[in-house]
């Protein structure tokens, strides 16, 4: 009798254990560098997260960590590669292990947001994205950080005005080489130091997308914004391949659907927000200068030396750029 009772207790305990594990949620931590009011975070919250949670009957919980709460870009990329962080949005940091991932930020590659979006939805973008799996990352979507523009305390209306301009650029050789091609004096420093450097007139200007200029308060210590649109920066929504391979196929389909919806809505929000930010900056004392055709042509022509260098350095470069141009 005792053995029967003991067996009954064991079966009951087993059923409770099975039942609780059957309904256990899988936690997906997703970290990124943008604020919680940035279009990318809003699109994650409203479309990516909700679609996955609702359509899997809350089998997954997507936890969002904006403002570098899970670490900076390099920590996110490393976490994705080794599986300690499930998902994230970063820029093109993976170009440090394979330069092809940096191609989207080559100067003057795109003329506007619509052209960039069209190319980033094309087969060549897909093909490049798939190469990330070799490094332990699955690309889910290309988002929009936006075109980089120049803010300055000097009025820049023609190419010759660039000469000697002390411009902060990221700690990245591509940006340094671009600046030198423009006859600009590049000053590499972390973003956290830029506001003070501008305030103390250590530098004359900096370059970043409109949204970052507003969110970081840089517009407060700058007078002019030159809409140079010299480099387009995407934001990549990614998931660790280790995490991805644990997700059943039927759920992977839902993740991909959510990522596609995220991509569409994030671009819509980002383009709308960029226009609002430009209006905000103009109302807060920044003069926005749209370069003349001659000025734009001078910038594009000056960048050709960079492409000559790319073509000599990378045997894939000419073919990839050709495919990008064909996708426009």
UniProtKB/Swiss-Prot annotation:
Signal peptide as annotated in the record: 1-24
Main location: periplasm
UniProt keyword annotations, A-Z: Periplasm, Signal, Transport
UniProt-listed CDD domains: PBP2_TRAP_Siap_TeaA_like
GO CC, one annotated term: outer membrane-bounded periplasmic space
Source species, domain of life: Bacteria
Biological process, per Gene Ontology: transmembrane transport
Places the protein is found: Periplasm
Family: Belongs to the bacterial solute-binding protein 7 family.
PANTHER family, per database record: PTHR33376, SIALIC ACID-BINDING PERIPLASMIC PROTEIN SIAP
Name of the molecule in the record: Uncharacterized protein HI_0052
Species this protein is from: Haemophilus influenzae (strain ATCC 51907 / DSM 11121 / KW20 / Rd)
């Amino acid at each position: 009798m005792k053995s029967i009772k003991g067996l009954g207790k064991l079966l009951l305990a087993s059923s409770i254990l099975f039942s609780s594990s059957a309904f256990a949620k899988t936690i997906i931590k997703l970290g990124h560098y943008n604020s919680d009011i940035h279009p990318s975070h809003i699109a994650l919250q409203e479309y990516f997260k909700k679609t996955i949670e609702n359509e899997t009957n809350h089998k997954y919980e997507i936890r969002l960590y904006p403002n570098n709460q899970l670490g900076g870009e390099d920590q996110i990329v490393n976490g994705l590669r080794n599986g300690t962080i499930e998902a994230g949005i970063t820029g093109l940091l993976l170009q440090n292990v394979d330069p092809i991932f940096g191609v989207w930020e080559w100067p003057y590659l795109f003329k506007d947001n619509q052209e960039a979006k069209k190319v980033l939805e094309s087969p060549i973008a897909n093909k490049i994205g798939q190469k990330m799996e070799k490094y332990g990352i699955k690309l889910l979507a290309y988002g929009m950080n936006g075109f980089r523009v120049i803010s300055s305390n000097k009025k820049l209306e023609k190419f010759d005005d660039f000469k000697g301009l002390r411009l902060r650029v990221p700690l990245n050789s591509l940006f340094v080489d671009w600046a030198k091609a423009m006859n600009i004096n590049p000053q590499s420093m972390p973003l956290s130091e830029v506001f003070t450097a501008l305030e103390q007139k250590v530098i004359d200007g900096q370059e970043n997308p409109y949204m970052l200029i507003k969110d970081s308060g840089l517009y407060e210590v700058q007078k002019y914004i030159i809409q140079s649109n010299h480099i387009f920066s995407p934001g990549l929504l990614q998931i660790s391949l280790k995490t991805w391979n644990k997700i059943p196929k039927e759920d992977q389909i839902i993740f991909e659907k959510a990522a596609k919806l995220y991509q569409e809505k994030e671009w819509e929000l980002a383009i709308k927000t960029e226009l609002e930010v430009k209006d905000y900056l103009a109302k807060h004392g920044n003069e926005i200068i749209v370069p003349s055709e001659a000025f734009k042509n001078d910038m594009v022509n000056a960048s050709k030396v960079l492409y000559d260098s790319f073509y000599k350095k990378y045997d894939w470069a000419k073919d990839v750029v050709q495919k990008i141009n064909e996708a426009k």
